[in-house]
Amino acid sequence: MLRRARTAIGLAVTALVVALSAPAVQADTTAPTGPSSDRAGADSAVYVVQPRSDGTTYTAIYEPAPGVTADELRSTLRRQGVRGVQDENSALGIGIAGCSPIVGTATAWCGHKWAYGPFNDPQVYFLDHSGDSWPVTDARVDWYQAPGIDAYYRWHTAGCPGGGRHCVHVYSGNYGTAWYGLTEASTSGGYFVDGSVTVKLNDQVTPNTYAARRSVACHEMGHALGLDHNGSTNSCLSVPEFPQHPSSDDFAVLNQLYPKPGT
């Protein structure tokens, strides 16, 4: 989805999304400002937004498969019965895409961040359900090095450790030919809801090479930490060109999204 929204529209829409997802957890006192309108490159992703009666908001980011346009993916999702598929310039879709902090071509995913819990940095565990061809543990190494947030790996049978730690379930499978990867979550008050964040990696369209699968895993895991897309092909958060690692701009966004307490 192209970032063509004007700042005034973005600010109004961000307020609308926050109002629809009334806080059920701590209020986000460092919420991002409005959507970015000056990012390099085009974002062809498709966003889904579903405000819910319990005050949470379900959101998802789909990355179109090769040869599939964003409009074609939207049509496919709607035919499959997915509600809340956002058009390119729809208010709710613009309202969750590409917020500050913005560093270079990297941005945060508006209203999607982890609570600190009892720690100085949020603790996020990726629980791996994926097949052997997906190097989730290697991709996690990159995100563990990011400042501001600690990312850990666990095989799914070990379970979520609890105690204020957060978990993201990572799956792989044959999900059709319309998209590479999907990150979905529920939020409340600008924070991820524990137990709701899921990554899905598509065996059916992602080339079965280490580079391609590490890139897609890195991309979706970055969303699960609170990042939106990056306009530079030096980052795995870009439109898939199969770069395998985050960029320094991605790390800088996380460092600002999760400042040390008291700073």
Language-model features and meaning:
Residues M1-T30:
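Secretory targeting and sorting signals
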Residues D28-T263:
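Zinc-dependent metalloendopeptidases
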